[in-house]
């Protein structure tokens, strides 16, 4: 039986749609009355694990799920040993550096050395600032990261940005982009090597459906 790790929240609906195109019907997870965290597919040949976004690559890396769908932001932050197979293209957003609009900074390299940068994505932030050779002090926050520059706890933030509305409403602007994040299909590497063909079939269908939607 194939097990697929699915993230609760923004990725879930599109993930279910894409998997249905590959013959895995997990529409039951979208039922608002559903309280199950392990949900069988309609055909009974697969099951879905409903987990937090950040836990998807963990379940896949440890082999408790053969496949998973997760944002590239989480993959980059977690750095788990999984196979990143298909860019599914939905739920796109930017991982950006932002500062107060009144700060005068217009590029990350203009930030002062050893300034504080707040983020939920400290691994991504650390790699970015190392790449531009700017030493910073990272402050790990788990929510409302925009408050960092407003309260003075940090000079800048690194966070996901979709429309930019929240930044604008809080007087912040983007000054650099780390990468563009979209949903990715990932797999457990050993499961891929031992695959009898079923996993590869799902992967190929999801790749082709992504290519078709892009045309």
Swiss-Prot record:
EC number of this enzyme: 2.4.2.17
Gene designation: hisG
Organism whose genome encodes this protein: Prochlorococcus marinus (strain SARG / CCMP1375 / SS120)
Coiled coil: none
GO molecular function annotations of the record: ATP binding; ATP phosphoribosyltransferase activity
PANTHER family, sorted: ATP PHOSPHORIBOSYLTRANSFERASE, ATP PHOSPHORIBOSYLTRANSFERASE ATP-PRTASE
Gene3D superfamilies, alphabetized: Periplasmic binding protein-like II
UniProt protein name: ATP phosphoribosyltransferase
SUPFAM superfamilies xref list: Periplasmic binding protein-like II (SSF53850)
Summary of the function given for this chain in its UniProt record: Catalyzes the condensation of ATP and 5-phosphoribose 1-diphosphate to form N'-(5'-phosphoribosyl)-ATP (PR-ATP). Has a crucial role in the pathway because the rate of histidine biosynthesis seems to be controlled primarily by regulation of HisG enzymatic activity.
KW Transit peptide (keyword) present: no
């Amino acid at each position: 039986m194939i097990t697929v790790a699915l993230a609760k929240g923004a990725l879930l609906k599109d993930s279910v749609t894409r998997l249905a195109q590959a013959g895995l019907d997990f529409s039951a997870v979208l039922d608002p009355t559903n309280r199950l965290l392990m949900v069988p597919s309609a055909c009974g040949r697969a099951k879905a694990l409903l987990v937090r976004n950040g836990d998807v690559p963990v379940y896949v890396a440890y082999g408790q799920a053969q496949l998973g769908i997760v944002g590239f932001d989480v993959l980059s932050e977690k750095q788990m040993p999984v196979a990143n197979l298909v860019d599914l293209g939905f739920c796109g957003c930017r991982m950006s550096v932002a500062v107060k609009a009144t700060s005068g900074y217009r590029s990350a390299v203009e930030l002062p050395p050893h300034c504080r940068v707040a983020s939920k994505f400290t691994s991504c932030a650390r790699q970015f600032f190392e790449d531009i050779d700017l030493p910073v002090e990272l402050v790990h926050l788990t929510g409302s990261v925009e408050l960092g520059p407003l309260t003075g706890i940090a000079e800048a933030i690194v966070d996901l940005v979709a429309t930019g509305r929240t930044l604008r409403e809080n007087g912040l602007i983007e000054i650099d982009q780390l990468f563009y994040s979209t949903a990715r299909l990932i797999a457990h590497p050993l499961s891929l090597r031992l695959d009898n063909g079923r996993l590869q079939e799902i992967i190929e269908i999801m790749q082709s459906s992504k290519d078709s939607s892009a045309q």
